[in-house]
A protein has these predicted regions:
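Metallo-beta-lactamase
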Residues: 81-132, 136-139
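Active-site neighborhood of phospho(di)ester-bond hydrolases with catalytic His/Asp-centered motifs
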Residues: 26-30, 50-58, 78-81, 143-146, ...
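Active-site environment of divalent metal-dependent phosphoester hydrolases
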Residues: 12, 60-63, 85-86, 128, ...
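Active-site metal-binding motif and surrounding structural segment of the metallo-beta-lactamase
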Residues: 33-80
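Metal-dependent catalytic neighborhoods of phosphoester/phosphodiester hydrolases
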Residues: 64-73, 88-91, 226-233
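Cap/insert and terminal regions of metallo-dependent hydrolase folds
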Residues: 153-251
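Conserved beta-strand hairpin/beta-sheet module of binuclear metal-dependent hydrolase folds
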Residues: 1-43, 131-147, 164
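Structured catalytic core of nucleotide-sugar glycosyltransferases
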Residues: 5-15, 58-62, 66, 120
Length: 268
């Protein structure tokens, strides 16, 4: 049985868990190590069940605890060479990943990590480098796309073959435009290497979701420029106008910024 948990999704910290009875992948590690230990305990899980870590990019809200968990548990950390370079230079990562645990991935090349087949793919974002991950386990395909400025053809392909999808819905353009952020930050967020809006997320689903898609989680919502109900309502409306009925075609939920999700069982 494949299971999924979110321990945090947003600028305050991102961390996701994909696991079976005998193997466990952590995707990003931007939640504090004390909070992680508490979350694992609350779910009746052990931190040492994690066998490998995947990192999407080197911004602090995705990596601040990766050196600690890797060093304490002797965990390999997989990401691109450029992201690893960014990690080694990131002052927010106080404890660096020891060289013996540094593992490189190549975009577009599938690798086997424990029980999982993992394919990293490029994601446009203004970090040193950025990737999403598509993970296959016993015929189930789970894909995570976060911190994404725009949808590329490659990203569209992975959406189209996914059964379970975590995808960014960061902001509502009108709230961003009217909000308190300085102009340069608004332009960064809304730019081609920034973050997906609710509308851009909805468009990606309309254009690429297949009948195989069962469940979608919206991730990395802005606290200032979005709201869970607004994101879900906006995306549901766009989907409905295109003939896609939530609950009939697939399920849609929002991952909370600071509160862990429920534990989801991902069925074939």
């Amino acid at each position: 049985m494949l299971r999924f948990l979110s321990f945090g999704s947003g600028s305050s910290g991102n961390c996701y868990l994909l696991y079976t009875d005998t193997d466990c992948l952590m995707i990003d590690c931007g939640v504090g190590i004390r909070s992680l230990k508490k979350h694992f305990h609350n779910y009746g899980l052990q931190l040492n069940m994690v066998h490998n870590v995947l990192i999407t990019h080197d911004h602090a809200d995705h990596v601040k605890s990766v050196g600690s968990i890797s060093g304490d548990l002797q965990l390999p950390v997989y990401t691109t060479e450029d992201v690893h370079r960014g990690l080694s230079q990131n002052w927010c990562v106080r404890r660096k990943v020891d060289q013996q645990y540094v593992k490189f991935v190549q975009k577009g090349e599938e690798i086997t990590i424990g029980e999982f087949k993992v394919t990293p793919f490029g994601v446009p974002h203004d970090s040193t480098d950025c990737v999403g991950y598509s993970v296959e386990y016993e015929g189930i395909r789970f894909t995570l796309i976060t911190d994404c400025g725009h949808i590329t053809d490659e990203i569209a392909l992975f959406i189209s073959i996914s059964n379970y999808l975590v995808i960014e819905a960061n902001h509502e353009p009108e709230k961003l435009a009217a909000g308190p952020y300085p102009r340069h930050l608004k332009e960064r967020i809304s730019g081609p290497n920034g973050h997906l809006s609710n509308e851009a997320c909805a468009k990606a689903l309309v254009e690429n979701a297949s009948p195989a898609l069962r469940h979608v989680w919206l991730c990395h919502l802005s606290d200032e420029n979005n709201h869970p109900e607004l994101a879900k309502k906006t995306i549901e409306a766009v989907l409905r106008d295109s003939g896609i009925i939530i609950g009939k075609e697939f399920t849609l939920e929002v991952l909370k910024r600071k509160i862990p999700s429920e534990m989801y069982e991902l069925n074939p």
